[in-house]
Amino acid sequence: MPMNVRLQPQVNISGDAERAAQGFGRVSRETPPAFDPGRQGEAAAAFFESHGYVVLSDCLSPGELAFLNTFCDRTQAQMPEVWGLGERRKPHHRNQGLIYSQPLLDHPELDPYVRHPRSFPVVARLLGGEERVRFAEFNLRETPQGAGAGAMNFHHDMVREDRLTRTPYMPCDWLCAIHYLSDVIPGAPCFCVVPDSFRYASLKEAYVGLGEGYREVPLYGQAGTCILYDTAIFHTRLDGDGDRMRRTWHQYYARGGWLRSALPTTDRYIRPPASVLTDWNLFPERLARSDDAATRLFFSHWNTAMGEWAAGGFDPAVRAAMPRGEQ
């Protein structure tokens, strides 16, 4: 791997640039609880529902960690361009350091991970049941050693406007599972959240609205740790010392199905299925057209690009012409 991959620093526009390079500089020293999903799934879900995120411990075995890290090492060596290690780095590479956006398309050996037995039951609980969970995205990322400080702005991912006022709030519409593939200790780039911020339209509104409760919480953990977060919560990659690396697996899920009114006097629909997360993500034919009905349902959340690719018989040329089609 070349050693000249550098993050492009952002200007702090989400918070207060006079106070900090990221956010408002109110970085918490607290260590949030970590839950064993096998024994504490209900408690983990309750924590998420209250705060918009939860830390799950020991979600990947040593063998799984070795497999995924070997996969990353091998594909970086054999297909450097898909990670952003070639001469022409795409904007999404520059924002993330290194990212392999769509590894599922060509690597069925990753299929067992999309509904991982440690984290997926908690995901299903949060989205309203296993039959409500839809696949959205699976990617692998790395902040390379010596990449410097990126000063990524705090942001939320995909949101629905009704999140600001709806009652009840849950189930959420999208959530992401970040699995640490390397130890994330102080000094390393770290996933960082603003708890309880999913009801706010901007970080500045959250800062005012949460008052003394506003805090930016770094989530450190050993390799195998999983963090689930509501895509409406404000979060960032908190810079470390600019030298240490971090490697992660990110998987996004969407909520499927129509939600009925909670009122006993009506059965009208009140919330539609979550919309598609991106306009470019594609699903492998082997999964989208699986013989297994539950797998087909899980991979049924198609965007227009996916629909056009399927209509074209999953033609490789159609895929290659799409953004990130071969990345």
Q: What is the predicted role of each segment?
A:
Residues P2-S50, S57-D162:
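Non-heme Fe(II)-dependent double-stranded beta-helix
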Residues M3-P33, C226, I233-F234, L238-Q327:
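Non-heme Fe(II)/2-oxoglutarate
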Residues L60-P62, L140-Q145, V159, D183-P186, ...:
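Short, solvent-exposed loop/turn segments at secondary-structure junctions
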Residues H107-P112, G213-V217, T236-L238:
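Active-site rim elements
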Residues F138-L140, A177-H179, W249-Y253:
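A structural signal for short, well-ordered beta-strand segments
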Residues A147-Y220, R260-D267:
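Catalytic core of non-heme Fe(II) oxygenases with the double-stranded beta-helix
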